[in-house]
C-alpha cells in the first residue's frame, strides 16, 4: 500500500534515521558467527554431558537411546523425544535483540538462554563453562574468553577481535516457574532444592525473556513498520535520558499496541507518529491505562517500575515530539539534519536489505518441533484443496504483468507533476489534454480521460528518451473494431507500431489498452451483442475459461453462429461476450448494411421529419402537428415502430410529440399496428383504418382522410399523443391547394404554437368549446379541440362530443370536437382556404365509414380551393391557410381511448 502523501516526508526522515542506526553488514556477520559458534559448542557440551550420564547406566539402554534404528517408527520418534526430555541440557534459545532483530550499531550485548532439565546449579554452570571452552576450540579457530557469573546465573563469552561482542548465556529451567506457581497456589513442595541452586529470580527473568522473544516473533515481526519504529525509538531512548526507562520490553509492547490497532498498514513516518500520539495521550500516566504484559498469566503492568515523575516526563516529551512532527520538524525528534526536499535517486541495490530479519534462525541446536510439520503431499487432503493450491502456485509462477508507460516513467522520474491543460469536446465525449515537464522539456498529449491522457504523455516522454514504452509486449494484433475505435479518438501520440488487423478476427483478443478506450462498438456504432442478436436470434454465450487473480481476472466467452465458434476475451464476462460477438460479425457479416434486414416489408413513402426541431420547409412548426405531409417525401432510412412521434425511434406508446407525420408511432408508413397484425399495411393503418372512407379516400386535395394527407391520425388524450399513418403513394402527385407556402399538414394533438400561428383558437370556436384564450390543453390545437374526452362526454373542450361505441361509431359532435375534428353537424364549419378540409372535395355532409365503424359527422364544408366557409352558424371563419392545425394537411384526430 502506498504511504499517505502527508506522511511521505516523515517516512523519508524515519527511514534515513533507520539506515544510519542500522548495523553494518560486517557487524551483523560478526554477531552471526559468534552466536552460531556458541550454539554449536553448547550442542556438543550437551552431547558430552549426556554421554557421561549414560556411561553410568547400562550399555544397552544407552544404545537404545543414542542410536535408534533407521526404520524408526512414530514410537521410535516418541522415544527420541523422551530421550531429549531426559537430557540435562535440553536446548539453547536466542532471546533479546538477537531473536527480535532489533540490533543497532554499537549493540554489543547478545543473549542466549540455556534450558536445563532440573534447576540449574553452580556445579552445572561450572561443568558447562569448562567444557564449552574445549568445544569452542573444536568448532572454530576464533578465540573466545569465557567468564562465569554465578550471581547472574549466566556464562559470559567475549570475543577477542573487533567488534568486541559479549554473549551472555542464561541458565534456567521450566521447573523454577512451576515450583513458584505451586508455592503461590499454597501447595507444599516435597523436594528440597540443592544448596548451590542459582538465583531463582534470574532464572525466572530468563524464562520471561524466552516468552517475550516468542511473542515478538509472532506479533510484531509481521507488523509493517513496527520493527523499524522500535529500532528508531531504541535510538531515541539512548539519546534522550527521559525516554531511558521505556527501553526494552515496555517500548516493544507500546509500539505493537499502537501500530497493531491501526485499521490499515502504515508507513514508518505515520507509524512513529501514532506511537507518539499514544504516549502523548497519557497512556503511561499514573491514571492512564498502562501497558498490559501479554506474557504473564496475571494482569501485569509492563511499566509498573516507572515512578510518577518518570511517567510525567515521558508524556511531556512525547507531546513535545508530536508537536514538532506536526510542524514538519520530525528531524529534531530524530536527532538528524533535515533532508532536502528532493532526494537524489539512489542506485537500485541488487541485494536489498531485509530490515526485518537481521540474523537467520539457528539450525544447530534445534529441538524436536512440538507441532508436526505440514505434509505437503498428504493423501488425506481433498482434491479441491489440492487443485486450489496448484492453481495458486501456477499463478505465482506466472511472470508479473509488464509495466505500462506511466509506471515506467514514474520509476525513472519519480514525483512528476501532470497538469491538465484543457478539456474540450462534448460532455459525453470529452477530450483531456495533459502535460508534464521532464528535464526542462514539456510534453503534451490528449485522451478521452485524464488517466489515458497521462498514459499518452508518458508514452511520448519515453519515446523521446528512446526507452521502451511498456506497450511492445502486448498483443500487437488488433481487430478492425479496435482500430476504428482508436481512429475515432484524437490521435495525439504515435503509439508503438501496430500490425494491421489480421484476417481472422475471431482469434484476435483485444489488448488492455483498447479496453480503456471506451465501449466496444461495431462499425455501425452498436453494441456487438445486440447487433448479432438482430441477425441471429437465440444465441448462447458460454464461459470457456477464467484466469488470473481476483484483481486481474481474464474471461474467455464463446458463441456459436451458423456452425462456427467465435471467442472473445476481456476483464469481465460482458466485455468478453462483446468481443466474441464482434468477431462473429466481422467474419460472417463483414459488409452488412446499416439498415436493418429484419423489417423488409413494403412501406408506403413517409414524410420527412417536421416539427419545431426538424422543420425542413417553411411551415409553422407545432407539437403534434408533424411536418409537411407531402407524399413525395422519401421515407427516412431507419424507421422504428414505437416512438415519440417526432423522432425516428423512441420508447413509449406512441406519444406523437413534435412528430413528423409519419408519427413515428404505431402507424409508421403503414407499418404501424398493421405490421403487428392490428390492421393491413395500408396508408391508413391506424386503429383499424378508423376513418378510411372508401368513397372519399382518394379525393384530390382534400380527399378522404385528411385532405391531401391521406394519413389517419389518432390522437390520444395526452399531449401530442398522435398516431399518424402516412398516405399511400397514389396521393404523391396530388398536392393539395393551399394558401401561402405552407405545405398542408394536419394536427395530431397538442398544439403549442399558438403564438406562431393560431388559425383558429378557442375564440373562433367559441360556440363549441370553453373560451380559453391560449390554453395549451390536451389536443387544444386549432380551436381548442382539447376534448380528449371522446371516451368520456366532455362538452367543455369539445362542445359536447357525444361519442358512443355503437356499431357505426357514430361520432356526432355538435362541435366536431371544436376544431379537433373540425367537421360536425352545423358546427365546425371552416374554410381551409386553399385546401379543403376533411372529406370529399365537394361540400356536403360526408359520412366517413371506416372498416371498423363510421364517424357520422355532418361536416358541411367547402371543397378544396374555394374560400367559402362551412355551413356553420357561429364559428364560420375564413382561413387562407386553412388547415386544421396550422397546416392544411388534415389528419382527422379521433381521440378515443
Curated annotation (Swiss-Prot):
Region (Disordered) location: 52-85, 363-401, 466-524, 624-662, 720-897
Cellular localization per UniProt: Nucleus, Nucleolus; Cytoplasm; Nucleus
Post-translational modifications reported in the UniProt record: Phosphorylated at Thr-188 and Thr-315 by PKR in response to RNA viruses. This phosphorylation results in the dissociation of ILF2 from the ILF2-ILF3 complex resulting in a cytoplasmic sequestration of ILF3 where it can bind to viral RNAs and impede viral replication. Methylated by protein arginine N-methyltransferase 1.
Motif (Bipartite nuclear localization signal): 371-389
GO molecular function, one term: single-stranded RNA binding
Acidic residues bias spans: 60-73
One matching Pfam family: dsrm
The protein's name: Interleukin enhancer-binding factor 3
Source organism per UniProt: Rattus norvegicus (Rat)
Amino acid at each position: 500500500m502506498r504511504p499517505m502523501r502527508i506522511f511521505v516526508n516523515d517516512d523519508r526522515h524515519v527511514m534515513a534515521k533507520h539506515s544510519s542506526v542500522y548495523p553494518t553488514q560486517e557487524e551483523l556477520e560478526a554477531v552471526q558467527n559468534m552466536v552460531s559458534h556458541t550454539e554449536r559448542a553448547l550442542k556438543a557440551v550437551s552431547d558430552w554431558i549426556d554421554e557421561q550420564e549414560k556411561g553410568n547406566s547400562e550399555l544397552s539402554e544407552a544404545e537404545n537411546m543414542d542410536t535408534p534404528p533407521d526404520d524408526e517408527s512414530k514410537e521410535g520418534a516418541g522415544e527420541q523425544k523422551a530421550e531429549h526430555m531426559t537430557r540435562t541440557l535440553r536446548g539453547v534459545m536466542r532471546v533479546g535483540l538477537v531473536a527480535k532483530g532489533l540490533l543497532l550499531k554499537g549493540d554489543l550485548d547478545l543473549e542466549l538462554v540455556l534450558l536445563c532439565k532440573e534447576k540449574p546449579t553452580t556445579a552445572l554452570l561450572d561443568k558447562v563453562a569448562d567444557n564449552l571452552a574445549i568445544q569452542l576450540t573444536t568448532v572454530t579457530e576464533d578465540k573466545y574468553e569465557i567468564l562465569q557469573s554465578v550471581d547472574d546465573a549466566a556464562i559470559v563469552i567475549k570475543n577477542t577481535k573487533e567488534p568486541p561482542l559479549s554473549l551472555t548465556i542464561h541458565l534456567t529451567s521450566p521447573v523454577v516457574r512451576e515450583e513458584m506457581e505451586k508455592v503461590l497456589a499454597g501447595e507444599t513442595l516435597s523436594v528440597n532444592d540443592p544448596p548451590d541452586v542459582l538465583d531463582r529470580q534470574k532464572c525466572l527473568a530468563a524464562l520471561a525473556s524466552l516468552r517475550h522473544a516468542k511473542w515478538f516473533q509472532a506479533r510484531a515481526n509481521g507488523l509493517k513498520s513496527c520493527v523499524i519504529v522500535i529500532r528508531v525509538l531504541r535510538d531515541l531512548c539512548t539519546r534522550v535520558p527521559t525516554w531511558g526507562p521505556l527501553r526494552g520490553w515496555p517500548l516493544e509492547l507500546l509500539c505493537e499496541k499502537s501500530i497493531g490497532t491501526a485499521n490499515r498498514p502504515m508507513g514508518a513516518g505515520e507509524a512513529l507518529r501514532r506511537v507518539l500520539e499514544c504516549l502523548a495521550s497519557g497512556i503511561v500516566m499514573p491514571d492512564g491505562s498502562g501497558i498490559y504484559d501479554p506474557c504473564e498469566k496475571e494482569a501485569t503492568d509492563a511499566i509498573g517500575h516507572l515512578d510518577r515523575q518518570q511517567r510525567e516526563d515521558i508524556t511531556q516529551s512525547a507531546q513535545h515530539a508530536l508537536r514538532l512532527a506536526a510542524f514538519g520538524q520530525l528531524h529534531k525528534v530524530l536527532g538528524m539534519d533535515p533532508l532536502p526536499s528532493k532526494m537524489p535517486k539512489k542506485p537500485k541495490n541488487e541485494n536489498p536489505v531485509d530490515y526485518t530479519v537481521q540474523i537467520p534462525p539457528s539450525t544447530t541446536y534445534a529441538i524436536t518441533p512440538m507441532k508436526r510439520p505440514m505434509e505437503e503431499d498428504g493423501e488425506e487432503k481433498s482434491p479441491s484443496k489440492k487443485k486450489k493450491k496448484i492453481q495458486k502456485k501456477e499463478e505465482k509462477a506466472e511472470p508479473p504483468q509488464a509495466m505500462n508507460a506511466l509506471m515506467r516513467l514514474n520509476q525513472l522520474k519519480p514525483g512528476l507533476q501532470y497538469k491538465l491543460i484543457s478539456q474540450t469536446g462534448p460532455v459525453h465525449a470529452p477530450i483531456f489534454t495533459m502535460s508534464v515537464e521532464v528535464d526542462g522539456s514539456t510534453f503534451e498529449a490528449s485522451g478521452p480521460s485524464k488517466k489515458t491522457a497521462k498514459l499518452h504523455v508518458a508514452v511520448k516522454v519515453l519515446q523521446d528518451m528512446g526507452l521502451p514504452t511498456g506497450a511492445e509486449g502486448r498483443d500487437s494484433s488488433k481487430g478492425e473494431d479496435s482500430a476504428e475505435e482508436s481512429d475515432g479518438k484524437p490521435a495525439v501520440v504515435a503509439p508503438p507500431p501496430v500490425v494491421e488487423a489480421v484476417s481472422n478476427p475471431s482469434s484476435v483478443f483485444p489488448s488492455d489498452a483498447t479496453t480503456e478506450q471506451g465501449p466496444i462498438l461495431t462499425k455501425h456504432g452498436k453494441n456487438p451483442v445486440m447487433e448479432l442478436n438482430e441477425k441471429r436470434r437465440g444465441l448462447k454465450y458460454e464461459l470457456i475459461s477464467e484466469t488470473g487473480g481476483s484483481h486481474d481476472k481474464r474471461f474467455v466467452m464463446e458463441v456459436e453462429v451458423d456452425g462456427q465458434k467465435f471467442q472473445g476475451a476481456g476483464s469481465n464476462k460482458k466485455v468478453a461476450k462483446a468481443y466474441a460477438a464482434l468477431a462473429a460479425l466481422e467474419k460472417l457479416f463483414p459488409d452488412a448494411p446499416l439498415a436493418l434486414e429484419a423489417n423488409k416489408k413494403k412501406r408506403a413513402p413517409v414524410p420527412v421529419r417536421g416539427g419545431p426541431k426538424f422543420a425542413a420547409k417553411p411551415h409553422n412548426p407545432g407539437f403534434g402537428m408533424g411536418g409537411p405531409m407531402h407524399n413525395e417525401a422519401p421515407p427516412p432510412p431507419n424507421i422504428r415502430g414505437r416512438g415519440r412521434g417526432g423522432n425516428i425511434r423512441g420508447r413509449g406508446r406512441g406519444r406523437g410529440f413534435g412528430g413528423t407525420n409519419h408519427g413515428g408511432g404505431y402507424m409508421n408508413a403503414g407499418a404501424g399496428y398493421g405490421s403487428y397484425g392490428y390492421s393491413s399495411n395500408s396508408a391508413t393503418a391506424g386503429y383499424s383504418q378508423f376513418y378510411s372512407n372508401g368513397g372519399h379516400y382518394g379525393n384530390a386535395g382534400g380527399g378522404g382522410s385528411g385532405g391531401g394527407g391521406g394519413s389517419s391520425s389518432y390522437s390520444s388524450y395526452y399531449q401530442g399523443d398522435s398516431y399518424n399513418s402516412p398516405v399511400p403513394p397514389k396521393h404523391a402527385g396530388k398536392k393539395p391547394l393551399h394558401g401561402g407556402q405552407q405545405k398542408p399538414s394536419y394536427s395530431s394533438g397538442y398544439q403549442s404554437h399558438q403564438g406562431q400561428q393560431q388559425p383558429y383558437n378557442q375564440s373562433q370556436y367559441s360556440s363549441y368549446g370553453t373560451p380559453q384564450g391560449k390554453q395549451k390543453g390536451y389536443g387544444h390545437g386549432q380551436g381548442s379541440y382539447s376534448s380528449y374526452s371522446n371516451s368520456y362526454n366532455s362538452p367543455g373542450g369539445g362542445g359536447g362530443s357525444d361519442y358512443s361505441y355503437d356499431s357505426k361509431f357514430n361520432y356526432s359532435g355538435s362541435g366536431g370536437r371544436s376544431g379537433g375534428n373540425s367537421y360536425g353537424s352545423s358546427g365546425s364549419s371552416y374554410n381551409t382556404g386553399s385546401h379543403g378540409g376533411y372529406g370529399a372535395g365537394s361540400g356536403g355532409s360526408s359520412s366517413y365509414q371506416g372498416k371498423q365503424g363510421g364517424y357520422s359527422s355532418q361536416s358541411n364544408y367547402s371543397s378544396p380551393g374555394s374560400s367559402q366557409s362551412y355551413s356553420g352558424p357561429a364559428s364560420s371563419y375564413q382561413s387562407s391557410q386553412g388547415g386544421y392545425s396550422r397546416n392544411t394537411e388534415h389528419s382527422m384526430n379521433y381521440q378515443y381511448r
